Amino acid sequence: GPTTGLLVLIDGHPQYMGLMGHPIADACQSMLADRVEVVRGPASVLYGSNAMGGVINIVTRRMHEDGVKTDLHAGYGSYNTLETEVTNQVRAGRFTSTVTGSYNRTDGHRRNMGFEQYGGYAKLGYRIAQAWDLYADVNLTHFNARNPGSVSEPILDNRQRITRGMTSFALRNDYGWTSGTLSFFYNWGRHRINDGHSPGEEPLNYRFNSRDRMLGVSWYQSVALFRGNRLTVGVDWQHFGGKAWNAFT
């Protein structure tokens, strides 16, 4: 696909469909993000062949000061568009947590262009020692989408039902002059798609189905040997794949 050369990361972990190799943009929701880092241009030396066109790294939320914070966001607009999000963040001593959920929908500006999405995210953290932190998080999203095709070449019954999930664990250290992370991640997806048909043609008698997965372990340690210098060493291992089939109706 055209987006296979752009690598999307969440907290440094790659996010793409394990069979097709492209990112699923709808799985990267704004409710996750504390900030977004962008590497422009080819970065394959550090990130692999998926980074030929650049890298987008989404850094997830966390509380930096003790307290409890709850945010509620809701918006409504044209074409019956609704977006909602609620987030609760806690920091109490060594413990931190972030829990957020969202619901979004729209009818679209054309017939058969509806979209609906549910999402949830949770992240827990604990400071083991002054320079050591442990984190675990999970992200789930499901969306239903319809595609009407182009105005000149419309498509009927083109529907998608897609579920994506992600979980990760990370052990981090930061001594100032040296820092590093040991992490594990596991991503999975379930796709059910009706490719649709042109007006006047018979509806398809099958639905495309797939299950995909991607998992990996990575470690790196960075050290500043002298002023203006930083040396980083690391290693990672990844496995991806899945299964695709047509289910006849």
Tell me the role of every PLM-derived stretch.
Residues 23, 51-53, 81-83, 117-119, ...:
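Transmembrane beta-barrel architecture of outer-membrane proteins
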Residues 13-40:
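Short acidic/polar hinge/loop motifs at secondary-structure boundaries
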Residues 86-90, 122-126, 169-173, 217-223:
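Residues on the lipid-exposed face of transmembrane beta-strands in outer-membrane beta-barrel proteins
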Residues 106-117, 127, 131-214:
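Flexible loop and strand-edge segments within Gram-negative outer membrane beta-barrel domains
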Residues 6, 43, 55, 60-90, ...:
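Short strand-turn segments of transmembrane beta-barrel domains in outer membranes
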Residues 226-249:
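Signature of Gram-negative outer-membrane beta-barrel scaffolds
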Residues 6, 66-70, 82-84, 93-97, ...:
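Outer-envelope beta-barrel architecture signal
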